[in-house]
Amino acid sequence: MSLGTTDIASETGDDSLSAITFESDIESKTKRKSFHKPPSTSPKSPYYSKPRKVTSWRSLKTAGSMPLSSRMSLTPQKLWLGSSKQGSVAQPPSPTLTSEHAWTHPPSCTPDYLTEAVRAKRADLRRSGSHGHVSGTSVYREKEDMYDEIIELKKSLHMQKSDVDLMRTKLRRLEEENSRKDRQIEQLLDPSRGPDFVRTLAEKKPDTGWVITGLKQRIFRLEQQCKEKDNTINKLQTDMKTTNLEEMRIAMETYYEEIHRLQTLLASSEATGKKPMVEKKLGVKRQKKMSSALLNLTRSVQELTEENQSLKEDLDRMLSNSPTISKIKGYGDWSKPRLLRRIAELEKKVSSSESPKQSTSELVNPNPLVRSPSNISVQKQPKGDQSPEDLPKVAPCEEQEHLQGTVKSLREELGALQEQLLEKDLEMKQLLQSKIDLEKELETAREGEKGRQEQEQALREEVEALTKKCQELEEAKREEKNSFVAVTHEAHPELHAPSPCSRHSEPDSDNSAGEEGSSQPPAPCSEERREAAIRTLQAQWKAHRRKKREAALDEAATVLQAAFRGHLARSKLVRSKVPDSRSPSLPGLLSPLNQSSPAPRVLSPISPAEENPTQEEAVIVIQSILRGYLAQARFIASCCREIAASSQRETVSLTPSGSASPPSLRASPGVIRKELCASEELRETSASEPAPSVPYSAQGGHGDCPSSSSLEAVPSMKDAMCEERSSSPRSAGPSLAEPSPPELQPLSPPPVEDICSDDSDDIIFSPFLPRKKSPSPF
């Protein structure tokens, strides 16, 4: 299609150019026809004499000397015309030749009047020659003129042939374009092609003419389709099978009335010849009355049927919506006589209640046009033979009043039943809503109970696991302490010169070396110093063990105290949210502390009604406290192992050097160690002294702490446990003194408070004591 469009564009361009040239050719052609005439038949042939070609060659010569621009615009025909046809009647073909007229006519010496006379003569001769040769008159023409005319005719013939060729080419192009356009029109009119093809053609064509033609074709097709649809609709409307039953009924009624009217007219027209005019008038009046009565009756019947239909619909709706449908449903199974009897009974009841109304209604004359079901059959009978006296007997008023009364009673019953139904529906909706609310509350209560049970179970399992871990850690701690005591007990007899005091013993060793050269010290002095050093070591070791145990017990008591405070705060919070819950009992909580396990198992007697963030926060606080305590216990155990291993290495490394030292040098470190250990004991007691009470805000982060009366049992329990634990090092004191000499057995170790040291700058190695745990940020 793109090639076709380019071809069409090129062809349209060529046609435009050819059309311009064609118009110019037509203009020149018409101009040539105005002065080119067929040659006159002369008796003398112009070919007997030789023509003179001076002027023609002169004109050609002058044309050759012309510039190129003017030469392109001149044709040989114009040159010949300008050179030889100076006396012709025709004017120059274009205004451009006026400028050429000056050089195509060379100047001559003949006067103007002679040239004008010659021109007039030649014009007369040509006019006479054009009308035909007249016998007896001779036409004289010069050979030069005849020759010029022949040349002009040949030139014109040649141009005509070129014009014919050009027209043939144009004709061929136009035929091709017409055939192509015919094909495109056939494609556009093809119904198998969709509108997309037309759109593509319109888009590819540069001009809007194709779009307009395509849209016109589309409009034409749409109009044809609309006409077809209208024809089908008209056929369906006129078809008998598609008409409405109500319309058919109305049409039949009108047809029946028209037939009846025509019958009456026919009967009246037949009886006109026999009856007088008075009877005719009476018959016409009676016919009018009958027709009006018939119309009124048909209208009344139609209204009654509509009312009956609406009442039936209301009754069906009432029966379907009423709750007492089980009672009324039996009427549907009754037979027609039974229903009629029931209606008669109801009518009697209504008539008994409305007896005064009936007496007044009987006095009134019945209307002949009363609406009653018995009038339905009247319209189907011919009314020609009926008289106006028979009409009042058609519809009794009594039956109509009975029916109206029954209808009123039924409507009242319907209203009452509908009100009852609405009340019952409202009650049922309220009951259903309350049932749904109760079910939701029950479901939430069940879910809360289930979650509470699961939480209690998880807390119990976690508490059991934590107590087991605490027991295991306490046992491991005891074993490590026992092993450390055994190692130190084995290492005491060999500790003659401890390494931490080596720098203090250096000057003593120098002094002793100086004294050794002069005189030897007495033996009893060295033995006394050794005994004093042994007693100092025993006292320091016992004090260290007692402090270590007290620090561990204080730490455990602090942790338990914080846990109990968190538990009491949590129970207080739960008690404030659940008023009917029982208050926690502190003796029940503290009873497991009297057992042997260091970390008692505390079970919460109060189960919260529902999970809340404060309860979870309290549980997290207790868990963090217990985990911190376990981590501290592990760290203390690892430190004890390292201290035991380092003490064993020191005793092994110091045993040979200590045995080689003299007695005087062995006794001096004992005194120094006694003083240094006393200062270390004072520092450790000040550092490891536990706080009497840890605020609950530091442990759990809550502001409401339990009262002091509820926590009195915790310090007392702590003191009792400390006394039980402190009794073990007192009993272990003599066992540590067993490796000492027998004369030192009755000596009792001095109290820690009596040992004092003025030298606080000296540093000795002492076993590691656990730091006091800082208050937990939880």
From Swiss-Prot:
Location of Phosphoserine modifications: 322, 661
Sequence ranges assigned to domain IQ in this UniProt record: 553-582, 615-644
Biased composition (Low complexity): 37-49, 352-362, 581-598
Keyword vocabulary terms for this entry: Cell membrane, Cell projection, Coiled coil, Membrane, Phosphoprotein, Repeat
Compositionally biased tracts (Basic and acidic residues): 672-686
Gene that produces this protein: Iqce
Subcellular location: Cell projection, Cilium membrane
Function: Component of the EvC complex that positively regulates ciliary Hedgehog (Hh) signaling. Required for proper limb morphogenesis.
Protein name per Swiss-Prot or TrEMBL: IQ domain-containing protein E
Coiled coil regions, renumbered to chain: 157-323, 398-486
Pro residues bias locations: 739-752
Region span, Disordered: 1-71, 83-108, 348-392, 443-462, 474-529, 573-612, 651-778
InterPro entries hit by this protein: CellDiv_DevSignal_Domain, IQ_motif_EF-hand-BS, P-loop_NTPase
UniProt-listed GO biological process terms: limb morphogenesis; positive regulation of transcription by RNA polymerase II; protein localization to motile cilium; regulation of smoothened signaling pathway
